[in-house]
């Protein structure tokens, strides 16, 4: 089994992005699966082009995109990606779409194929906070999650794909009072647990567990 794991470069004025820093530190093999690591730009469309080339080259069984969600306390596997680009800030090439569809011929939304409840449980079992998230935002994180699902829908039907958000690093919140963060080593530990759960649940589907939200 082969899993392509991607992490974004820094954006929004930060000099570091925990996504790519954590991805780079993942082991080369987790629970018997080969881990392919890829840095992608925080840029609408270009990020998808980079991922598509890697899919064509590596032919992974799974794709897990990792992104920073500053303000969240734990690791949060994402349930759904929506067909909208709506940038709160410009991307790293200065592009700021304001309520535009990602693909005119794409579905309104795509659900992940990954066992997000099993991922969240595995992360918590590793001693770290985690919960299922029902929104990946409307920036490049949601964009790449949606784009990979669109690729799956149109070109790569055998791939299973999803996204997980991670918190800020402590050094990123020095001047962001009362903002949660997580040590890089713990983020790596959490991602490793999530990836192990993906491998363990291969062919079995997700677990039955309470992970819903009222709002």
UniProtKB/Swiss-Prot annotation:
Question: Pfam families, from UniProt?
Answer: Peptidase_C15
Annotated catalysed reactions: Release of an N-terminal pyroglutamyl group from a polypeptide, the second amino acid generally not being Pro
Q: Active-site residues?
A: 78, 141, 165
Catalytic EC class: hydrolase
Provide the E.C. number(s) assigned to this enzyme: 3.4.19.3
Report the PROSITE patterns cross-referenced here: PYRASE_CYS, PYRASE_GLU
Q: What GO molecular function terms would the record report?
A: pyroglutamyl-peptidase activity
Q: What is this protein called?
A: Pyrrolidone-carboxylate peptidase
């Amino acid at each position: 089994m082969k899993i392509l794991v991607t992490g974004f470069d820094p954006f929004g004025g930060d000099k570091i992005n925990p996504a790519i820093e954590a991805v780079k530190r993942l082991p080369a093999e987790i629970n018997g699966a080969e881990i392919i690591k890829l840095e992608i730009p925080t840029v609408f469309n270009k990020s998808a082009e980079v991922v598509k080339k890697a899919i064509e080259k590596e032919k992974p069984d799974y794709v897990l995109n990792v992104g920073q969600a500053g303000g969240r306390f734990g690791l949060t596997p994402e349930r759904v990606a929506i067909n909208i680009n709506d940038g709160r800030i410009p991307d790293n090439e200065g592009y700021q779409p304001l309520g535009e569809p990602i693909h005119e011929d794409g579905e309104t939304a795509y659900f992940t194929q990954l066992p997000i409840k099993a991922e969240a449980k595995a992360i918590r079992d590793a001693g770290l906070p985690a919960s299922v998230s029902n929104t990946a935002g409307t920036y490049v994180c949601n964009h790449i999650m949606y784009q990979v699902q669109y690729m799956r829908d149109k070109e790569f039907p055998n791939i299973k794909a999803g996204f997980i958000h991670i918190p800020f690093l402590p050094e990123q919140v020095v001047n962001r009072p009362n903002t949660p963060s997580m040590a890089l080593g713990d983020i790596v530990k959490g991602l490793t647990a999530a990836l192990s759960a993906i491998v363990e649940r291969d062919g079995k589907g997700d677990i039955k567990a309470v992970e819903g939200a009222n709002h």
